[in-house]
Amino acid sequence: MSKSQISREFAAASEQQLKALCERRFDQTDILVVYIDGIPFGDCHVIVAIGVDSDGCKHVLGLREGSTENGRVATDLLNDLVERGVKPDRPRLFVIDGSKALRCGIDAVYGSRNAVQRCRNHKIRNVLGYLPEDQKDQAKCAMQAAFLLDADKGIQKLKQLAKWLEQSYPSAASSLLEGLEEMFTINRLGLPKTLRRCLGSTNVIESPNSGIRRRTRRVTRWRDHAMVVRWVAASLLDMEKRFKRIMGYEQLWMLDAKLKDLPVADAVDQEAKVA
């Protein structure tokens, strides 16, 4: 069998896998946590959503070509999840990168009665990107230590760090303070440390990301963005077969209870956010 024939057969198979993924329904699956992050492939970005049900099992929910910073793409992905059964009729925890467009999309599509946790790994990388090498370790350790504290104490510690950074590294200070409250959502919910370790970042997506790159390392040329999306879909579905339940899944009932206690957003406030 020639290489070109193998390539055509794989393209056809991966197209079917992508179609199957995009048509999945979750009406009978109680999705409690939704992780959303982007995977870059050169000039192409793919947004991936992975859900965790109330038993701690992971599910590949969907994907879209585009960046999380693209408001229309992010909202399209969220609307697609709603259409396929991840309805806005129950509060959830969304764990996302630092994208403002994605954050706004969650309120617009799912309403304000949801908890949003921003990825701490993204925040650390963003802040360190503004610092010289000799300052990175100290800042990283300070941030990681603050994340272990109660929400109010942790926020206060990072505000102190930002005040210190402001003197010489104002961009790092600004990056640190952006979205600071939502860095501590899981702390404010009073969740146990074991569960917080898994809910504080988008590692649930970043780990499959490394697996996708291993599977695609032999690809020397991406013909188009459609090829990237097909490969990502095929790789995710293959890895999903070996997904394990998240760490601390036995304590997810606590998250469920905390989410159900969240106040229902005022209708006027909700309309303003959607607008």
Model-derived regions: residue spans:
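RNase H-like nuclease fold core
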Residues: 2-95, 100, 104-108, 112-113, ...
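Alpha-helix N-cap/helix-initiation sites
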Residues: 3, 117, 221-225
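Solvent-exposed alpha-helical segments within well-ordered globular domains of core cellular machineries
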Residues: 4-12, 72-79, 83, 104, ...
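A generic short alpha-helical patch detector that favors 3-5-residue windows
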Residues: 41, 66-70, 94, 116-119, ...
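Inter-helix linker motif
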Residues: 111-129
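Conserved phosphate-handling catalytic cores of large alpha/beta enzymes
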Residues: 124-153
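Acidic/histidine-rich catalytic cores and adjacent linkers
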Residues: 145-275
